[in-house]
Amino acid sequence: MTPSHLGQVLAVLRGPAVAFTRPGSRSAVAKSAATGPVAVDALGLHGDEQGDLRVHGGPDKAVHHYAQEHYPAWQSELRPLPVLDAPGAFGENLASSGVTEKDLCLGDQVRIGSVLLEVSQSRQPCWKLNDRFGVADMARRVQHSGRTGWYYRVLEAGALQAGDAITLVARPWPQWPLARVMAVLYQQPFDAAVLTALAALPLTPSWRRLVEGRLARGGVVEDWTARLDGTPHQP
């Protein structure tokens, strides 16, 4: 396909994993904007960390992207929160303008700087957003809204920086915008044919378990409580 312009990177963010809010927990959700080019390899941005490698990071979740377009909606829906005053509220590595979950499809390949990225999955929000925002149901709000952000795997390492263009270079599954995937998984009634079609794609392991498990249970939805709410002693 002919490469097409999608948007622009507004900020590149990274940060260390530190002790978080609950006993034994760690998080790198609080990130700082980088100046100048940042190297990116198969595991993400150099200088960035993840607090819980069981559910964050790795090749399928190497880079987290969140649309700055969503910030006004959150500012309108929530009480004034300083965390929303600048990019990085959701622990994203890339903040951008011009592209949201409606504009990107599963498997899309995008070029940012010299880095080639592939959309691997949408974010599945967890309880750490509740604690970061001081809003008890923030993770549920993010999931229900579809304003989740998304992850990339890195196909070609390189460097990127704020101001870089976001260019679409391949779209193998135009029928699967991320917004549709999230609606199928979290909003719409069970449709075996639609989930079967989704299962035919090369999904990440976590999404494959989710989709195939739901099909095997005849549409019974998995319990999201631990992920969305955590426990007082969440590790």
Predicted regions and their residues:
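Loop/turn positions that initiate beta-strands
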Residues: 107, 157, 162-164
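A mid-sequence, solvent-exposed acidic-amphipathic segment
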Residues: 136-153
